[in-house]
Amino acid sequence: MAIKDVQTYIDRHGLVETTDSEVDKPIWRRPGFNGIRSLLEMEEELSRFLRERRDALNLNREQVGMMVGLHQEIYARHERAGAKLRVARLLHLAELLDFSPVEAVYAAAPHLFGDSREEAEVKMKLIMRMLDLPSSTAQHLLMMIEELSPDSPLDNPPKRSKA
């Protein structure tokens, strides 16, 4: 059943009404560390992240485009924020360029990881360390964390403070 009063939801989650050049109507967003990053700025950060990953692997656009099934010029649009990056394409690129989708989300929206830049950086480092853990170590860490915080995050979504 839908929430009867969406304004209560908006207030509880610290959302603010804003405009964005990508959307014709007002939208609600959660402010980041320096206000609200536009949707285009987030696309540009995703693009920069993809380009840096590709460069770090010494691949060119033609090679990545071929692996994705796109002409190099079409793929290049993703690296210039000229084409919207669908989630499925991002996941495919994560497979090809050997990154976690979490890294891409962090590049575009670090404010989703903490209330300050420092907190977000710490949490991102922790996430990346956890992703590299052997399975048995991850299981032990999970058991330890569950002892510290017995409620499952799926049962009780985290309450984010208003930015």
Predicted regions and their residues:
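Interfacial/linker helices and their anchor residues that mediate assembly or domain coupling
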Residues: 112-163
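Short C-terminal boundary/hinge segments that cap the last helix of small helical domains
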Residues: 98-115
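N-terminal flexible/basic segments that precede or flank functional cores
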Residues: 1-44, 137, 141, 161-163
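Short, basic-rich loop-to-helix N-cap that marks the start of a DNA-contacting helix
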Residues: 58, 81-95
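Short alpha-helical DNA-recognition segment
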Residues: 55-77
